[in-house]
From Swiss-Prot:
Family stated for the protein in its record: Belongs to the peptidase S10 family.
Organism: Arabidopsis thaliana (Mouse-ear cress)
The keyword Transmembrane helix belongs to this UniProt entry's keyword annotation: no
Signal peptide: 1-23
Gene name, Swiss-Prot/TrEMBL: SCPL53
One Gene Ontology molecular-function label: serine-type carboxypeptidase activity
Protein's UniProt name: Putative serine carboxypeptidase-like 53
UniProt keyword Secreted present: yes
């Protein structure tokens, strides 16, 4: 009885959060348009400092305290056997946290679904929704993920057009404060910015690949929509990331990010 009650609570929280995410996302295009108008103003210039920050990030920062974590055990804990009301599928899915800043207590939540049938050869795609602050779970369950929500708001059905038909999909809740991602430091919420978001995304990827090392060496793409068009540009700082993790690129086919895309 207690387990059934826990699932009921989980289902309610999931559906409430999905509805809240959808409501929030309806305004992201307005935020994006205001930003573009301000950038086109007289004397204005686009801030690219976050790209330089990514280049300065070291792997030693990315791997802080990672040696004390058994990544294989953490991966097993992240395994999602079944979502509430989901149909039977032939791929695995995972959800969990990756700490990107130990001292601040800042952790990002991810939802990962393997490619159907071809997980061992398909590329890895990182998906980011816009906002800023729009949950990538909205993208996962309303746009390009493997499931959609039935009209009864209680069960799921498979999405025949899911991107995981051709790729391993990694949905990231970023920046901290978005969706299930959180921080224990108040100033993180008071002083957000693209530079901090890009740096956290970089650290997340380095640590995530320690948890899922089988995806090192894969073709790697970054994709997103709306304001995420600003985030995906941190691919220019992925050279150091690729050097350490042998992720294929479009530049030299051995390091960094293989491609990027932004959907308006």
């Amino acid at each position: 009885m207690g387990k059934l009650q826990d699932w009921s609570i989980t289902t309610c929280l999931f559906l409430f959060f999905l509805h809240a995410s959808q409501t929030h996302c309806t305004s992201q295009s307005h935020v994006r348009n205001r930003l573009y108008r301000s950038k086109r103003g007289i004397g204005s210039s686009i801030d690219t400092s976050h790209l330089n920050a990514i280049r300065r990030l070291s792997v030693s920062l990315s791997l802080q305290n990672i040696s004390g974590v058994n990544q294989q055990e953490q991966k097993e804990r992240d395994l999602i056997e079944n979502l509430p009301g989901q149909p039977s599928v032939n791929f695995k899915q995972y959800g969990g946290y990756v700490t990107v800043n130990e001292s601040a207590g800042r952790s990002l939540y991810y939802y990962f679904v393997e490619a159907t049938n071809t997980k061992n050869s398909s590329p890895l795609v990182l998906w980011l929704n816009g906002g800023p602050g729009c949950s990538s779970l909205y993208g996962a369950f309303q746009e390009l993920g493997p499931f959609r929500v039935h009209s009864d708001n209680k069960t799921l059905y498979t999405n025949p057009y899911s991107w995981n038909n051709v790729a391993n999909m990694l949905f990231l809740e970023s920046p901290a404060g978005t969706g299930f991602s959180y921080t224990n430091t108040t100033t993180d919420m008071e002083n957000p910015g693209d530079m901090k978001t890009a740096a956290d995304n970089y650290v997340f990827l380095v640590k995530w690949l320690e948890r899922f090392p089988e995806y090192k060496g894969r073709d790697f793409y970054i994709a997103g929509e709306s304001y995420a068009g600003h985030y995906v540009q941190w691919r220019h700082g992925c050279g150091d990331f690729g050097d350490s993790y042998n992720v294929r690129t479009e530049d030299d086919e051995s390091n960094g990010c293989y491609g990027m895309a932004s959907v308006v």
